[in-house]
Curated annotation (Swiss-Prot):
May act as intramembrane protease. It is found in: Membrane; Endoplasmic reticulum membrane. The PAL motif is required for normal active site conformation. The chain crosses the membrane at residues 86-106, 157-177, 193-213, 304-324, 329-349, 352-372, 402-422, 451-471, 476-496. This is Probable intramembrane protease YKL100C. Residues 561-587 are annotated as: Disordered. Residues 1-85, 178-192, 325-328, 373-401, 472-475 are lumenal. Its EC number is 3.4.23.-.
Amino acid sequence: MDKYLNSFVDHLSEWSSRAFRNNSSSANQSASNKELEQVFEQINAIVENHNNKLTTAFDKISYRVAHKITHLVESHSLVFNYATLVLIASALVVIGSFTSISSIPFTALPPTREHSLFDPTDFDVDHDCHVIYRENDEDKKKKKKSKRFFDMMDEKHAIILPLTSGCTLLALYFVIKKLHLNWLKYVVKILNFNITLLNIPAGTFVYSYFLNSLFRNLSHLASWNPLVVLPRYRVTIADDNEDLNKIGGFVTNLNYKDGLTNSVVHKKTLDEIEKDHWMKHFYRRELVEPKDIKSKRQISNMYLNSALIVSFVLSIVSTVYFYLSPNDWLISNAVSMNMAIWSIAQLKLKNLKSGALILIALFFYDICFVFGTDVMVTVATNLDIPVKLSLPVKFNTAQNNFNFSILGLGDIALPGMFIAMCYKYDIWKWHLDHDDTEFHFLNWSYVGKYFITAMVSYVASLVSAMVSLSIFNTAQPALLYIVPSLLISTILVACWNKDFKQFWNFQYDTIEVDKSLKKAIEKKENSITYSTFILSEYYNDADKYALLGDDVNENFDDDEEFVQEEDLSDSSEEELSEEDLLDDESS
């Protein structure tokens, strides 16, 4: 396989070299190209010198930490290094699984303020589940593009994901092997710039989750008011074309008062302003109660809390530092951790069937590019971008730098999305077994057997990969150990508990029903909310338990019978209405 791959890359390099030679055929063009290269080199030298001055202190910290880690590795062999990698990877998967909850399951009730486990962050997830109608083959042919209310990875991604990943790897391999070193630097800078931009939303998401989770649990344990610890804000942009207030000034509204405000302090502040003539003039508009902002005057609203503000600032700081010093292994690891957690939260598997197919496809993809070729090893070791976890092993005195042991983010994010799906099934199953229970983040009963089984299997498979690496002293595809361990253990537990069929086809926040319901309810939309569905006259207790079972279509064996029953009910209603009219006329 290496032979065919190298020949393919050679053909590409010949074609690119011919193109470069044709573009620079004349002597004037070659001279101008050299001048441009010199200008770019001078600019890069100036920027690098400027960055070195700004990041000298941070580089010293990184080097000191790296030297201490290498000292620990030398004194404890590679056990310390491998154990650290396994611990970090496992922690990222656990955190990513917790952050993947963006809605409540349709088996749960929405959270309420009166519950003992309530926290304001319970309202930060979607409460509306969706009821969608199954489409037959004819409908799928008519609708080439169907609107979806959720973005989940299904069976088709088992083909798309390995193909796109393989094309990306081959493109990077071609850049490393055949293009000039300067071109490789530009490619790395472009990739780092893209990751720098992505780190802003990823870092904000991760840091916000940490702060919200920390203060959520502290407020519950210490019986604090969570709205005092993490107050929530609403920033409204509205037009003032109707009231026409005086322009200028940013003054605190003194009439702001709610249950959290100390009334004594509020009254004391107003008395002090009334006594001071200058202060009274300054707050002259704020002493009068401002008019309410009508909804039709509100241009946009932004909802946030103090944790989100702090997280955004931390994300900006880490992004700027990574931009100034992209080669620092500490900040590179921090950015990689943000990307890993964010990826697990965004990659949502539909059910066990889609997760198993995608992992099996990636299993063969990983083996092909690690054992069959040197593509993955070459790209991972030559591109210094934050798509891997790296820990220093020893200091190379000849090259005056550190040698690192690495673990790709794909070995964290891809199994992580499967483990997150197991965690969602535990939540879904817990509410199914406990009727009429509300969803709350503080409910630690959500950590169930499938999530624990998947995590134990993941840790065991990572340890097996590390042991094989130390024995054979060659790069090991971690998915070779992770995929069989995850699938076999999860499926065995599901079969043992007789949940396999349910787990194989379940959907966390979406209910699929037969299309006959669409005719009965007479809705033109492709989906309705769960709350609307349960309030409809076609939903009774028998239908409720059928929806939670294996197949909804069992209650709708024959569409004609269902329509006939509907017609009979309509006719009976008509007869009743005629009798009522006759009674009214006689009276």
